[in-house]
């Protein structure tokens, strides 16, 4: 999403927050010198709701959803924008996406349950997953889920056995495209746990098997080549490879789901493509090699919510090791943001109390957990961090809450949506008693 253009260039230049691509649109340093998001002072929010806390700009999320829809509407009426809900699987997020006219992608029975609870019409739900259980498939079929994305021969047989009516399906294929991103979020290469390979004829066999089915109605193909992608050319190549496959098996898909994957800015220096450019490449690519009536589906997740959210922490300890490092320890860590440990992900950080001051202390923001690797941000400049400060890491809106865990018996943080200066809790903070709730 483009940054808020309403601010003058001089104001933006003087405000490091407004100038940064990693914060929600409209974020700034307020008159008290503090970080402000969606009109909310982050220090005041931390005092009110406690820390750690996931904090989102609701308008930022809505703005990005509308930008996707607008970008398609300017080019075609044969499209569907599908929220990849694994990025932020909270009922409030599902509800917001439904209100903005998006469909939803769910990858488990739990995500399906939340989508239905948020009011999504079953016909607008797309069920994914490389190992869907019989219970999940039964739930989906009983609910009337619109589209099932088939991922294996075992699943084809399982679905065929459970169904007593027609079910619209897409076959997930792996086009053999390897974009420049982390190995753990590459999904389109031949060696992948997802989908049917095009190069090894598995996809061709899958098409034939589904065509023989009495209940599975093949309406299209799905291909997702990976996540956090800054290059657009791999999408073009993937579409061309899929088109060649369709010609080879005489398939004229009603739907072509070209996945998600658009990267976001995690660092001030990151320059991901704009949503409009991303949509242009996909629409032009599909129109060049497929029938004009083919409906184009995309599945954004990270690019909808990633830069819309930040995480706020409270500093508990500042430990200087002379000649080595200064550790700023906060009251969260790998239980609320696993990505630095899982992917080696890098983040910015700011002292929200002094967001407008020039950072002068080289520090490492460490978590509270019993792991030496529990480091959120390594070797970053902070403005004189002291005990009691609120430290914020931006661009945590995707896969922070989704991957949160109870390591060391730490309750998971709340999710707070902010709009026009008001913050509201949409997921409450867990308590110590919650940790006992499932014990027998």
Locate the predicted segments by residue.
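Hydrophobic residues within beta-strands of alpha/beta enzymes
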Residues: 104-105, 125, 148, 221, ...
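Flexible loop residues that form catalytic
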Residues: 130, 153, 226, 261, ...
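Charged (often Lys/Glu-rich) extended helix/loop segments that serve as interaction or gating elements
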Residues: 281, 287, 292-440
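Flexible loop/turn segments at secondary-structure boundaries
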Residues: 89-92, 113-114, 157, 177-179, ...
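A charged N-terminal "starter" segment
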Residues: 1-148, 153-168, 204, 208-217, ...
């Amino acid at each position: 999403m483009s940054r808020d253009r309403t601010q003058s260039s001089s104001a933006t230049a003087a405000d490091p927050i407004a100038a940064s691509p990693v914060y929600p649109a409209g974020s700034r340093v307020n008159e008290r010198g503090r970080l402000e998001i969606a009109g909310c002072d982050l220090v005041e929010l931390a005092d009110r709701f406690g820390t750690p806390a996931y904090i989102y700009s609701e308008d930022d999320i809505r703005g990005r959803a509308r930008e996707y829809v607008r970008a398609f509407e300017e080019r075609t009426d044969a499209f569907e924008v599908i929220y990849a809900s694994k990025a932020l699987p909270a009922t409030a997020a599902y509800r917001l996406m439904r209100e903005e006219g998006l469909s939803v992608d769910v990858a488990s029975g739990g995500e399906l349950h939340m989508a239905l609870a948020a009011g999504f019409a079953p016909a607008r739900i797309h069920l994914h997953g490389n190992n869907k259980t019989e219970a999940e498939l039964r739930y989906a079929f009983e609910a009337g889920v619109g589209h099932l994305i088939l991922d294996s021969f075992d699943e084809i047989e399982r679905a065929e056995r459970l169904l007593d009516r027609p079910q619209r399906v897409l076959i997930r294929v792996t086009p053999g495209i390897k974009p420049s991103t982390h190995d753990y979020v590459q999904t389109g290469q031949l060696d992948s746990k997802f989908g049917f390979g095009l190069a090894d004829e598995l996809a061709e066999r899958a098409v034939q098997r589904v065509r023989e089915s009495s209940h599975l109605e093949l309406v299209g193909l799905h291909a997702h080549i990976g996540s956090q992608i800054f290059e657009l050319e791999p999408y073009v190549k993937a579409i061309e490879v899929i088109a060649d496959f369709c010609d080879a098996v005489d398939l004229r898909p009603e739907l072509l789901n070209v996945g998600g994957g658009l990267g976001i800015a995690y660092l001030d220096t990151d320059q991901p493509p704009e949503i409009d450019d991303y949509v242009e490449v996909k629409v032009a690519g599909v129109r060049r090699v497929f029938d004009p009536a083919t409906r184009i589906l995309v599945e954004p997740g990270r690019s909808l919510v990633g830069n819309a959210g930040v995480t706020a922490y409270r500093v508990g300890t500042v430990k200087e090791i002379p000649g080595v490092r200064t550790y700023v320890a906060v009251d969260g860590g790998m239980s609320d943001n696993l990505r630095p440990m899982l992917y080696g992900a890098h983040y910015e950080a700011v002292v929200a109390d002094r967001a407008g001051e020039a950072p002068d202390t080289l520090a490492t923001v460490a978590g509270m957990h019993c792991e030496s690797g529990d480091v959120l941000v390594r070797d970053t400049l902070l403005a004189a961090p002291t005990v009691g400060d609120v430290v914020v890491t931006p661009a945590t809106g995707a896969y922070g809450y989704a991957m949160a865990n109870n390591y060391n018996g730490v309750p998971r943080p709340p999710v707070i949506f902010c709009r026009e200066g008001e913050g509201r809790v949409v997921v409450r903070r867990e308590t110590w008693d919650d940790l006992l709730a499932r014990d027998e």
